[in-house]
Amino acid sequence: MSINGFLIAAPQSGSGKTTISLAIMAALRRRGLVVAPFKCGPDFIDPGYHRMASGRASINLDGWMCPESFVAETFRLHAEAADVAVIEAVMGLFDGLGASPLQGSSAQIAAICGAPVVLVVNARGMAASAAALVKGFAEFDPDVRLAGVIFNNVGSAGHAELLARVMASALPEIALLGCIPRDEALAIPSRHLGLVTAEDNPLPPEYLDRLADLAEKHLDLAGLAGLRITPRSVGASLSRTNGGGMLPVRIAVARDAAFCFVYQDNLRLLREAGGELLFFSPLADGALPEGISGIYLPGGYPELYAERLAVNVPMLDAIRGAARDGMPLYAECGGFIYLTRGMEDSQGAPLADFAGIFPVRARMLPKRKALGYRQVECLSVSILGPAGETARGHEFHYSEICEMPVDVTRTYSVTRQGAFLGQEGYCLSNCLASYVHLHFGSNPCLAPSLVAACRKFAATRRS
């Protein structure tokens, strides 16, 4: 099946690729096209904005967390259901974080997916030098196909004409797909890894309309929408499971402004393993969904909603009761904090009381505590699988756990690029909590193991 689409990249962060990606998504959607949005890397923030611009959930594509076969499979699965796929890059096009120079880079994703690259170049103060920069990117990696360029921060119509002449003369094989004029009012507030979330700072319809108008006026939208994906073979896809034909098992998944950081493929893989996902709000709901046999608490920013979470005592009681009954409960980062006794400031003064399943408090810090990719090895059996399994994910937080008791099982050995960071993945009964956001695509046993644990609990409860 043929797929139209492209990857929007840049030489470096701050070039305007997110704003331009949103403008293209909004404009193509307004033209009646179904847009499938994607984001390179582990970021949860830009996908929230993608959803607002495109009307569809954005999918993370990460070549470090997930095998290439999984990346190719999930891209094809989501892109085939749309008219055009728009992939937003992360950092500079060739900037990776893995052991090899390009692993984890947007260039790797472009190569895996066979996506042509559209390079967004900040042309402020440049003319012929801009073409030289584009030429370097076009020739750097033969596995990456640079199909077009968009110049951003163009100072005037004359500047745009000069850039067009230079490109036509020096690089006629690379399409000039538009010149975006300088407009500081179009910038999105600082949002890197969540300083501002899409839920906290939703894009107003009039802002999206302005972006769509900008794209209509200054970009070759037909040329962009006509770019074709060239599928490449990257090995066998990961095997899937549908739960062995058994009836679905209900799993409650927290989803609101406080708990909005989740990889969409985690939810898909849980469904494919036989999970029936029921969403609930720890902020607004007074009870858990009926008939559930498991709970998934994703990450987010509970510290921004601490008081509202703390006063929702019926929900806290329901979470405590589920844990007491032995229901499988998996929590990541913000979800983990929600399961502690509560939060305190950097001086130890209490801020809010939470579920108290783990006998410890989370302390907020003035500076970032952790950021980066993580690999975990399971030291013991848990609701995510047997001992010896490995998985990959990402960690980002401004809090720390204050002296977790030694009798609480540490399920994970955590490393960063091979360097040992410590043991966590705290386990009490059937509750597993960690600061690491695991991508279930990194290991095909994770989602089926969690669903199997929920199914086992359901069977025990029936008996």
Curated annotation (Swiss-Prot):
Active site: 333
Catalytic reaction(s) noted: cob(II)yrinate + 2 L-glutamine + 2 ATP + 2 H2O = cob(II)yrinate a,c diamide + 2 L-glutamate + 2 ADP + 2 phosphate + 2 H(+)
Keyword ATP-binding (UniProt): yes
Biological process, per Gene Ontology: cobalamin biosynthetic process
Pfam hit, one: CbiA
Listed GO MF terms: ATP binding; cobyrinic acid a,c-diamide synthase activity
EC class: ligase
EC number: 6.3.5.11
Keywords: ATP-binding, Cobalamin biosynthesis, Glutamine amidotransferase, Ligase, Magnesium, Nucleotide-binding
Cofactor: Mg(2+)
Residues the UniProt record annotates as site (Increases nucleophilicity of active site Cys): 437
Domain GATase cobBQ-type: start-end pairs: 250-445
Pathway note: Cofactor biosynthesis; adenosylcobalamin biosynthesis; cob(II)yrinate a,c-diamide from sirohydrochlorin (anaerobic route): step 10/10
Keyword Electron transport included in the entry's annotation: no
Function: Catalyzes the ATP-dependent amidation of the two carboxylate groups at positions a and c of cobyrinate, using either L-glutamine or ammonia as the nitrogen source.
General remark: The a and c carboxylates of cobyrinate are activated for nucleophilic attack via formation of a phosphorylated intermediate by ATP. CbiA catalyzes first the amidation of the c-carboxylate, and then that of the a-carboxylate.
Family classification: Belongs to the CobB/CbiA family.
Domain notes: Comprises of two domains. The C-terminal domain contains the binding site for glutamine and catalyzes the hydrolysis of this substrate to glutamate and ammonia. The N-terminal domain is anticipated to bind ATP and cobyrinate and catalyzes the ultimate synthesis of the diamide product. The ammonia produced via the glutaminase domain is probably translocated to the adjacent domain via a molecular tunnel, where it reacts with an activated intermediate.
Protein's name in the database: Cobyrinate a,c-diamide synthase
